Regions:
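N-terminal propeptides
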Residues: 1-100
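Gly/Ser/Thr/Pro-rich low-complexity, intrinsically disordered segments
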Residues: 98-442
Length: 442
């Protein structure tokens, strides 16, 4: 990939720049390789290739070696034998500056950490055939990640493409989204990936996962707090298209390059952690979203409250998610690294839950029999993933309870129902997907 000497085709640094450009590694990974100053033999092709092969791809989904093994360039066994997969991996993974819980040893998952059972279950309301995957999320080497296509709201991709690019042992569809023709494909409920919220609208049951493997279930009432100097501002939602005179919403690059303004109010722009612009806006305007920042949109009634303080240009600020004072979910927001949401809730505190949240009272959530996906939590903390080609919500409730779940929620289903296990498509959806939950054991 290049040499440092004068006779080389191009420099070592230039070759790393090219690797970043084509998505072989992140900029941070390339800089890390340079800073480590490996004792390479003239930094030649073989040595650099080993470093590159064991470095995660730009999207963080897998290492280059794992991706190549997935595509059949060489086998997993050959990769492990050469130290390219498993214990030989260098960790150059970007993470947000937050406490993600006690780290787990980086090693291959023990046998039994992930298991799959396919069978027909006899239930009070009728038999259901399902794939049931149980995951010991606290086992060494196991990690749970939520993923959104291109980390952008509204982006979608065929499930087969998501599976091919991931390298995860288990992939399942997650949040409901506006899926039909002409709709924006935005998700429903919270979505957090790699410790960063991509979408935040409270009200639905969410599954949250920490870096140490703990699983939390509840309806976290999340605010997004921007703090600077002696002042602070609370945004009720993140990247929501809903705007109101009494609301406050924060927009990040996951929303897009700009945000259309629908109400009269104030827009505050933050770039690089510093407030760069504060101005009055009116419905019909558009405000650019910085690639390294975000925009806060406050409605006119919100800014008229006695406790609102006008932001000042030049103020250094931080953005952190937190729970409202009235929240009872108990989510440790400083430790959560992944979150997906769904509805209706199926099991709560070890008992069947028949309450239907707003938006989940149509026939497809009550009497209809269709393909479904569900997440559950066992009493010992393990995660249960269920995928079935035919079940009613009541049957799904009964199944999750029979499996021993103390908490469970229904995820998107119907034409979105998707499951991949160890690289094989077990259940293919009838449409492109936006958000998935992925389990890694290496």
């Amino acid at each position: 990939m290049g040499y440092d000497d004068g006779a080389g085709d191009f420099t070592f640094a230039a070759s790393l720049d090219k690797a970043v450009e084509i998505g072989m590694m992140t900029r941070a990974s390339a800089d890390c390789i340079l800073q480590k100053q490996y004792a390479l033999y003239r930094r030649d092709l073989v040595d650099l290739s080993v470093s590159a092969l064991t470095t995660p791809l730009a999207d963080g989904s897998a290492t280059l070696a794992e991706s190549l093994a997935k595509k059949g360039v060489f086998t997993w066994e050959e990769g492990r034998a050469q130290g390219l997969i498993g214990g030989g991996q260098e960790s150059y993974v970007h993470s947000s500056l937050r406490n993600t819980g006690a780290p787990k040893p980086e090693q291959s998952a023990s046998s039994g950490a992930v298991s799959r059972v396919t069978k027909t279950y006899a239930l009070p309301s009728g038999s259901v055939s399902a794939d049931v995957i149980t995951v010991d999320t606290s086992a060494p080497g196991v990690s749970v990640r939520a993923a959104m296509v291109n980390q952008k709201l509204g982006a979608s991709a065929p499930f087969s493409s998501i599976v091919s690019a991931s390298g995860a042992d288990v992939i399942v569809n997650a949040n409901f989204f506006a899926a039909y023709s002409g709709q924006d494909k935005f998700p429903v409920g919270h979505v957090m990936a790699d410790g960063t919220f991509l979408y935040g609208v409270s009200g639905l049951t969410s599954f949250g996962f920490t870096g140490s493997g703990a699983v939390y279930v509840g309806r976290p009432a999340v605010f997004f707090y921007i703090r600077g100097g002696r002042n602070s501002w609370a945004c009720y939602e993140m990247n929501s298209k809903t705007q109101g005179s009494d609301l406050s919403v924060v927009y990040t690059p996951a929303f897009g390059g700009s945000v259309p303004i629908k109400i009269d109010g104030t827009a505050t722009t933050v770039a690089g952690g510093v407030i760069t612009d504060v101005r009055a806006v009116a419905a019909g305007e558009t405000v650019a979203i910085p690639a390294n920042g975000y925009v806060m949109v406050f409605g006119s009634d919100f800014t008229s409250t006695t406790w609102y303080r006008e932001p000042s240009v030049g103020t250094s600020v931080t953005l952190t998610p937190g729970l409202t004072d009235s929240d009872t979910s108990g989510f440790p927001m400083e430790e959560i690294t992944a979150m997906v949401s769904g509805g209706p809730r199926l099991v709560e505190n070890g008992a069947i839950c028949t309450t239907l949240e707003p938006g989940f009272q149509e026939a497809r959530f009550t009497s209809a029999v269709t393909s479904r996906t569900a997440l559950g939590k066992l009493a010992d903390g393990k995660l249960v993933i269920v995928s079935t080609g035919s079940a009613s919500i009541q049957q799904l409730r009964e199944l999750m309870l029979q499996l021993g779940c103390v908490e469970a929620v229904n995820l998107d289903g119907g034409g979105s129902t998707a499951l991949a296990y160890q690289g094989k498509l077990i259940r293919s959806p009838g449409r492109e997907l936006t958000t998935t939950l992925q389990i890694f054991t290496h």
